[in-house]
């Protein structure tokens, strides 16, 4: 059976890693049998999660994993036209190459309170003797990545303004559709859910989260996918009733 290596589940969401959540959601949407083995990035190929083992085959990076799943098991995008595939790719790039950095800034740099929540969720599984060292090492590493990407060169207000533009675009593109590309889930939905649940459903507070919660169609979308594909989890609680005053 295919083995998915990812972070330990916490926060009442499928995974606190956007990309782990994306990959597991694709597996569930595609009806592919798998088992999960929790691990940390320092034990992973390329130093990143998720990665999979499929027999003797080992593969890292959610993009390459999903390409493998499409080829060997089931392609959720098989009915999309070339134009629809282009739209899907563009939206995934928005999620994974832009919105991602605003959420990472929220967790690793924005406030000490957010960092403590993030630190506990990721590093509490380590022995105390190495826990703080690993947390400091990875925090500095990710802060350098945020700066190198360019996001970290902006003020907090500017970073969240850019992230809110992404949220507005996602809400407008989804509209009143069941899924982003229509009536059936596609690869874009696996990615969108992974990123939206990690914005709306995690205990990391920021103006970006508040803005995302103000979008009724995005809240309903996250709850709909949670109920359909993660029956072992609860949908958004008070967030589902949230309305911006």
Language-model region placement:
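GST-like domain detector, emphasizing the conserved glutathione-binding G-site
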Residues: 1-132, 200, 245
């Amino acid at each position: 059976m295919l083995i998915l290596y990812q972070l330990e589940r916490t926060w009442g969401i499928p995974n606190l890693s956007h990309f782990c959540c994306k990959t597991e959601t694709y597996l569930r949407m595609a009806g592919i049998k798998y088992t999960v083995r929790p691990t940390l990035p320092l034990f992973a190929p390329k130093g990143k999660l998720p990665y999979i083992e499929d027999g003797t085959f080992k593969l890292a990076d959610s993009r390459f994993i999903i390409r493998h799943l499409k080829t060997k098991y089931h392609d959720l995008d098989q009915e999309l036209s070339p134009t629809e595939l282009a739209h899907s790719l563009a939206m995934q790039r928005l999620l994974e190459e832009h919105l991602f950095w605003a959420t990472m800034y929220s967790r690793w740099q924005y406030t000490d309170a957010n960092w403590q929540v993030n630190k506990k969720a990721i590093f509490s599984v380590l022995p105390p003797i190495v826990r703080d060292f690993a947390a400091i090492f990875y925090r500095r590493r990710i802060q350098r990545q945020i700066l190198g990407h360019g996001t970290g060169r902006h003020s907090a207000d500017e970073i969240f303004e850019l992230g809110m533009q992404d949220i507005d675009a996602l809400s407008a593109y989804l509209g009143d559709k069941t899924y982003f590309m229509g009536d059936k889930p596609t690869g874009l939905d696996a990615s969108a859910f992974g990123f939206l649940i990690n914005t709306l459903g995690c205990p990391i507070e920021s103006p970006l989260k508040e803005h995302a919660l103000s979008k009724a169609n995005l809240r309903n979308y996250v709850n709909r996918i949670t109920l359909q594909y993660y029956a072992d989890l609860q949908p958004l609680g008070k967030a589902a009733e949230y309305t911006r005053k």
